[in-house]
Amino acid sequence: EDGVSCEYGTSNPSSLCLWGKQQGMWYRLEEYYYHSRLTGMSRTDEEHYAGLVALIAGRPVAKIVVDPSAASFIAVIQRHGAYLVLPAKNDVVDGIRAVSVALKQGDIRICNTCTDTIREFGLYRWNDSMHKDMPIKENDHAMDDIRYFVSTVLSERSDDFFVMATQRC
């Protein structure tokens, strides 16, 4: 089972990630990370879509979880009709908690091929000047797409609870 998570940016970086599930654990396998301010060139939605297709590279992706504010990119993916798109759940603080739990429990793992993700983990910080818990809005693009994936895909899991009814004698 494979999936993709997307944090879409125009002037800020776009971070797209290919996830693969094996033996109940999700692995962040590959990433597409494009920072237009560093390259000096913006990309269109179609160019980011081409990057998405290259990232997927023919794998059987079940769903693509996308930043819910990226309406134009969601529309491009839907127009091509190749993938199921889910707008991501976007509660920041609950999502960060869920990612922390998923990492601690080993539900997700980050492969060493995801260098921008690894770099961002070292730079991600809470904003101490705010009166509420919020991260600083820089070096958070891969962190956001991980949060989208965990909040949207891992939250779909069942807790294996069920009710059984039997006939009384």
Protein language model annotation of sequence segments:
Residues 14, 62, 143:
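Residue-level detector of short, conserved catalytic/binding motifs and their immediate flanks
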Residues 2-5, 11, 97, 102-103, ...:
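Structured catalytic/translocation cores of nucleotide/phosphate-coupled proteins
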Residues 17, 23-137, 156-157, 163-169:
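Mg2+-dependent endonuclease catalytic cores in nucleic-acid-processing enzymes, primarily RNase H-like
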Residues 1-21, 25-27:
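Conserved helicase/translocase motor-coupling segment
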Residues 7-9, 69, 146:
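Anionic group-transfer/hydrolysis microenvironments
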Residues 136-158:
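Acidic, Mg2+-coordinating catalytic module of metal-dependent nucleases/exonucleases
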Residues 8, 124-126, 148:
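Aromatic side chains
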Residues 14, 74, 151:
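Active-site-proximal flexible loops/turns
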